[in-house]
């Protein structure tokens, strides 16, 4: 009986770890690179900001490729969280594990094992994670991004502002839209800090006034 209890306890530790690893591997799929290859576009790591993300794919001149990249990058943040939500409870995985798995997917996008750990900045993937954790939180964050992008035309500034407000929204929404979880808050803070860190060069360009505005295309559009 005691051995059976020990086995069950060890399995309860194994499942969250396995889910976290799976989340990281899903996050490591760099769809900006994959979609660009499939659609015959230049590698987004070779032009514009050299960032493998939807915004830089848009600079290639293909709106379709950018939209597909955006949706897939968001989906890879959303899916691991939802898998835990749908199937995790019998295995001891609840809200804290969902946040951990989402963070792992986000880190996978930033440092993808399949692409030499050279990834994007994680904005779309972070939004997908938020959508899995709380659609209301994702809506508030997305609205913040849209407002900033519309008025200032800087994707990076919109992303940075949204990142700062994510944990703020989560704290102030406690007791109204959700009940605060320290594990979720820690994951959100970690995502926000990592996203800001990945935008260090953008911050420098914003200060210097040399940051590219939304809609600016790269010179090279398609493979020759």
From Swiss-Prot:
Primary residence: membrane
Catalytically driven reaction(s): an acyl phosphate + sn-glycerol 3-phosphate = a 1-acyl-sn-glycero-3-phosphate + phosphate
Keyword Lipid metabolism belongs to the record: yes
Gene Ontology CC, one term: plasma membrane
Keyword Ligase among UniProt keywords: no
Pathway note: Lipid metabolism; phospholipid metabolism
InterPro entries xrefs: G3P_acylTferase_PlsY (IPR003811)
EC number: 2.3.1.275
Keyword line: Cell inner membrane, Cell membrane, Lipid biosynthesis, Lipid metabolism, Membrane, Phospholipid biosynthesis, Phospholipid metabolism, Transferase, Transmembrane, Transmembrane helix
Residue ranges crossing the lipid bilayer per the database entry: 14-34, 64-84, 98-118, 127-147, 160-180
Localization (cell): Cell inner membrane
Function, in words: Catalyzes the transfer of an acyl group from acyl-phosphate (acyl-PO(4)) to glycerol-3-phosphate (G3P) to form lysophosphatidic acid (LPA). This enzyme utilizes acyl-phosphate as fatty acyl donor, but not acyl-CoA or acyl-ACP.
Listed NCBIfam families: glycerol-3-phosphate 1-O-acyltransferase PlsY (TIGR00023)
Subunit structure: Probably interacts with PlsX.
Family to which this protein belongs: Belongs to the PlsY family.
The protein, known as: Glycerol-3-phosphate acyltransferase
Organism: Albidiferax ferrireducens (strain ATCC BAA-621 / DSM 15236 / T118)
């Amino acid at each position: 009986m005691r051995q059976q209890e020990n086995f069950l306890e060890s399995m309860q530790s194994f499942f969250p770890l396995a889910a976290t690893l799976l989340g990281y591997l899903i996050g490591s799929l760099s769809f900006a690179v994959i979609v660009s290859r499939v659609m015959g576009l230049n590698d987004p790591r070779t032009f514009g900001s050299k960032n493998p993300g939807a915004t830089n794919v848009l600079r290639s001149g293909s709106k379709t490729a950018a939209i597909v990249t955006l949706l897939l990058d968001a989906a890879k943040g959303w899916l691991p969280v939802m898998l835990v939500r749908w199937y995790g409870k019998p295995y001891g995985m609840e809200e804290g594990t969902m946040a951990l798995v989402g963070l792992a997917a986000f880190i996978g996008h930033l440092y993808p094992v399949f692409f030499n750990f050279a990834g994007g900045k994680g904005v779309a993937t972070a939004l997908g994670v938020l959508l899995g954790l709380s659609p209301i939180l994702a809506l508030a964050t997305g609205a913040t991004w849209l407002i900033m992008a519309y008025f200032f035309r800087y994707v990076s500034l919109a992303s940075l502002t949204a990142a700062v407000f994510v944990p703020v929204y989560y704290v102030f929404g406690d007791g109204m839209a959700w009940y605060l979880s320290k594990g979720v808050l820690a994951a959100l803070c970690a995502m926000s800090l990592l996203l800001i860190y990945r935008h260090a060069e953008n911050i420098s360009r914003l200060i210097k006034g040399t940051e590219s505005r939304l809609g600016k295309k790269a010179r090279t559009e398609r493979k020759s």
